[in-house]
Design a protein with these regions (language model features):
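Bacterial N-terminal signal peptides that target proteins for export
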Residues: 1-7
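Bacterial N-terminal signal peptides
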Residues: 7-15
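Short, well-ordered beta-strand segments enriched in hydrophobic/aromatic residues
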Residues: 38-40, 133
Length: 158
């Protein structure tokens, strides 16, 4: 009997979480023509201030293995009017640039995920709201979770 009560309570909690996520998605408009809406719901953490989410935007392209490439472009944070929720918009990726090391012309090309150039784009970790990114349909959005070490060190004076 206790197991049945536990399972019932667990199902109820899952349904509430799912309903909340669905309610939150009502705030985010559908993507426009030629755009895709990416959605990430991160799991709850005990201390979410110790985490960040890195948004990684790019395309998979067939290239040589030796050079370093990147796209021009940016990620812009916007706020959904009337809701106050953040969303992120990626415009068209600019031209691809890269190093020009001499590579064997007969070397096979490989599929590589080429990202936006510049610093990593880190955003606040928040399990209560979905992370929503609007991007062109030919662009991929990936992510990485960063976690801070609980150890804090003293910095020297000088």
């Amino acid at each position: 009997m206790k197991a049945l009560n536990f399972i019932t309570a667990l199902c109820f909690l899952c349904a509430i979480g799912s309903a909340q996520a669905a309610d939150n998605m009502k705030a985010f408009p559908p993507p426009g023509d030629g755009m895709v809406r990416y959605v990430l719901q991160v799991p709850k953490q005990d201390d979410e201030s110790m985490f960040k989410v890195e948004l990684i935007v790019g395309k998979t392209v067939k290239l040589d293995k030796g050079n370093r490439y990147f796209f021009g472009g940016n990620i812009k944070k916007e706020t959904i009017k009337g809701w106050g929720f953040p969303c992120y918009k990626v415009g068209k990726l600019g031209p691809m640039a890269g190093t020009r090391m001499a590579i064997d012309p007969n070397a096979p090309k490989v599929n590589r995920f080429i990202t936006l150039g510049g610093e990593p784009y880190l955003i606040r970790y928040n399990s209560r709201l979905p992370i929503v990114v609007y991007a062109p349909s030919d662009v991929e959005v990936r992510y990485r979770i960063w976690r801070a070490s609980p150890e804090v060190k003293m910095m020297g004076k000088g």
